[in-house]
């Protein structure tokens, strides 16, 4: 896996072996950032990588110039991989935080996030819980841009204050752009 663009372009990042982390393919990550590039002012945004796995989304956002990124995962292997990958690109620790929490048990937010990528284990039912927790704990900016990665056949019932604005398929992966209404 490599960082696609920005100051860390071409840098390799690691993924833990085994089945605890399912990394987003470079193709899907590239498609995600192609969508976001048209609607995000990277230099004035904070990015949140939920169920971060390797931290690839947040590191890619840092590479493209976000002010700050946060990473959330409950897997010890994912947190270790994310720490390793951030150290590997030599990112300044003042520009990120890592939370080893389950999405249902988040602390109150220290800041709000403009761009949120949620990539839980497929069919785990975590997306509605994550959205509810992020909203209730103050993690979402006033008009956040939320991307959810799911399996192509997964059906998600979103909380009523969220609606799907765009849906795209890439192989067996589906990307949903969600709006807070």
Descriptions of predicted regions:
Residues 1-181:
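Class I S-adenosyl-L-methionine-dependent methyltransferase catalytic core
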């Amino acid at each position: 896996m490599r960082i696609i663009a920005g100051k860390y372009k071409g840098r390799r990042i690691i993924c833990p072996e085994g089945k605890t982390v399912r990394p987003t393919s470079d193709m899907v990550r590239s498609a995600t950032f192609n969508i976001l590039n048209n609607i995000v002012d990277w230099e004035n945004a904070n990015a949140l990588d939920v169920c971060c796995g390797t931290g690839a989304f947040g590191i890619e956002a840092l590479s493209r110039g976000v002010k700050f990124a946060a990473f959330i995962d409950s897997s010890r292997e994912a947190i270790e991989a994310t720490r390793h990958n951030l150290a590997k690109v030599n990112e300044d620790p003042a520009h990120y935080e890592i939370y080893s929490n389950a999405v249902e048990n988040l602390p109150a937010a220290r800041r709000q996030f403009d761009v949120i990528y949620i990539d839980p284990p497929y069919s785990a039912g975590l997306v509605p819980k994550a959205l509810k927790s992020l909203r209730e704990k103050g993690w979402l900016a006033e008009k956040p841009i939320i991307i959810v990665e799911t399996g192509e056949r997964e059906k998600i019932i979103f909380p009523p204050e969220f609606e799907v604005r765009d849906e795209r398929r890439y192989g067996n992966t589906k990307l949903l752009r969600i709006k807070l209404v």
